[in-house]
Amino acid sequence: MPEPIRIGWLGAALDGPGGGYDKIHRMAFDEAVESGLLDRPYEFVLHAENGLPNGSARNATDGFRYLVDEGCIAVAGAYSSDNAITVAPLANEMQIPLISWAGTERLQGEYCFRLGNGDCGGDAALVVQWLKRNGHERVAVLSEISPNGEEYFRFFRQEARRRGISIAAVETVSQSPADLAVHLESLRKAEPDALVYMGYGMLAAKGLMREALDRIGWDPPRIMGTAFMFYLMGFDKFEGWVGIDQFAPANPLVPRFLERYRARYGEDPPMWPNAIPLLSYDTSRVLVEAIFRAPILSGPGIKAGLESIRFMPSSTGGPQTHIACSPYEHGMFRGDWLLYGRVTNGRLEFEGLFEQWED
C-alpha cells in the first residue's frame, strides 16, 4: 500500500481534532478518495499554532517547522494576518506551500497562497460602497492598531476620498483598550451618519464592542470589514452590525455542501448557517485539486498544482465566485467572493452583493 500523502493544518482545525472543522476537511478528502480523484491514502497532521495575537510569533513558526518535519507537503493555516506575515518567509525558505485565509497584501512569495477570509483593500472598497449606497456620507471611524487595522484604514481613506465620503472623526485604539466606551463616546459627539470599525475583530468577538455601545446607549448604522466573520464567537456580540461576509444562500454549492455534511455526520456544520464551514471546505478542496494536478508529490509539485487551477467552483462567496491561480498570482478567489451580511435578532442575514457604480 502506498504511503499516505501528508497535509498539515496549522491552527486550521478551529475546534480541535475530531471537531466540526476537522470533519469538514476530512469530508473533502474522503469524497476525493471515494470518487477516485485521489488514488492514494491521505493523512492529516494537526498543530494548534497558538500564534499571534494571543500567543507568540515563535509558536506559529515552530508549528510550521513541526509540520514540515512530519513530512507534510502542504500546510493550510496561519489564518490571521499576524501569523501569515510571520510564517510566509519560512514557507518560501522551506519550499512548502502555505494556504492562508489572511486578508493582508503582505502575504507574499512563491510558496504563499491566499484563500482570503477577506481582503484589506477589498473590504474597504465594499464598506465605502455600502455607506454611499445608504446615504451615509459623514462617518466616524474606530481604527485599531493591528496589522489588519492599519491596512484597512489606509485603504479606507483612499476609497472614502474617491467616493466623496467625509471622515468626521477617528479614534485610534489598541486591541485591548482600557475603556472602549470612552472612545466610542468621542466618536458619537461628532454626530456621524454611521460608525465604521476597521480592525482585526477581537474587540467585537470578545463582546467589548457591544458592551461599550450598550453602555453609552448608542445604536448607529454601523459596518465593519471581514472582522464580521468572528461571529463564529457568538452572533449576539455582533447584533446590529453589517459586515463583509462570504455566505450567500443563493450560491448553488451551499445547499449541496450542507446536504453532504448532514448525510456523512448526521448533524449541522458548526454554527450553521455561516461562511466559515464553507471556507474550510473550499480550502480542503483546493488542496485535493493541487494534489491531483501536481506533477510530483513534493512542495514544489503542490505549488505547480495550485498554480494550474482555473475556474474551480467555490462554495464560499456569491453565485459567481470561482477559484483560480497562476504563477505570481496567488490570491485565489475570483468574482463576487466578498459580500454583505447583517446580524439581526441573533441570526445571520444576507445583506447583498457588490453592485456596479458609476462616476
Where are the regions that the model predicts?
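Extracytosolic ligand-binding ectodomains
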Residues: 1-359
